[in-house]
A protein has these predicted regions:
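N-terminal edge beta-strand
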Residues: 9, 14-17
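Short beta-strand segments of immunoglobulin-like
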Residues: 19-23
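A surface/secretory-pathway sequence property marking extracellular, secreted
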Residues: 7-10, 56-121
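Low-complexity, polar-biased intrinsically disordered regions enriched in Pro/Ser/Thr/Gly
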Residues: 16-17, 66, 148-150
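Conserved small/polar residues in nucleotide/adenosyl-binding loops
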Residues: 1-5
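Short, isolated positions within intrinsically disordered regulatory regions of eukaryotic proteins
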Residues: 18, 111, 125-129
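C-terminal, structured domain-capping segment
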Residues: 24-56, 125-181
Length: 181
């Protein structure tokens, strides 16, 4: 429950994780749940917008080939396999998002921009949020890209930056959806 006098961004599941659980490695999925809260003590509902900035880098990546059939053979009738890594882009470095996420229902993508260093998304929640209420998380987890070991220096920070903007619905009376604001 929100109890302050403003909008706030929380990540309840992420905040519960010990630091060692937040360490990423290729293919790892970790809980991360940016949630917007209308913490205003007034009676005004607010439209909530989340901006998410994902780091990008020019690296080599790989895909796990899932070719195994139920009988243990693969589609090429070679030795049984449980999946093998196949280099993407012919093994050449290419610019990729270092993490990915799947937005939850109720959030609409308003804008998306990419540079060599970042991929930025702006999402709006589908309706105004009453004081003391919160949105469901924009997403529940993030997955680190399958980056070839050594392509990023060990200890490279993979910061996912989330920013919240709230607009009181009383000041945009003509708006019926967050996209109208």
């Amino acid at each position: 429950m929100c109890i302050r006098d403003r909008a706030e961004l929380t990540e309840p599941e992420w905040d519960k994780l010990p630091d060692e659980a937040k360490v990423l490695y290729p293919g790892k999925t970790v809980a991360k749940d940016p949630t917007a809260c209308n913490a205003a003590e007034s009676t005004t509902a607010a439209y909530m917008y989340l901006q998410v900035e994902i780091p990008r880098a020019s690296v080599r990546t790989y895909t796990i080939a899932e070719t195994a059939k139920a009988d243990g053979s693969d589609e090429t009738n070679q030795e049984p396999t449980s999946g093998a890594g196949v280099l993407d882009n012919g093994g050449e470095p290419h610019t990729v998002d270092l993490v990915s996420f799947q937005p939850n229902d109720g959030w609409s993508l308003l804008e998306e921009t990419e540079t060599e260093e970042t991929h930025t998304f702006i999402y709006a929640y589908e309706s105004a949020i009453a004081p003391g209420a919160q949105t469901p998380p924009l997403f529940d987890c993030v997955t680190y890209a399958n980056v070839v070991e050594g392509d990023l220096p060990q200890g490279t920070a993979v910061d996912i930056i989330c920013r919240l903007t709230a607009i009181q619905s009383d000041y945009v009376a003509d708006a019926n959806t967050p996209q109208d604001v």
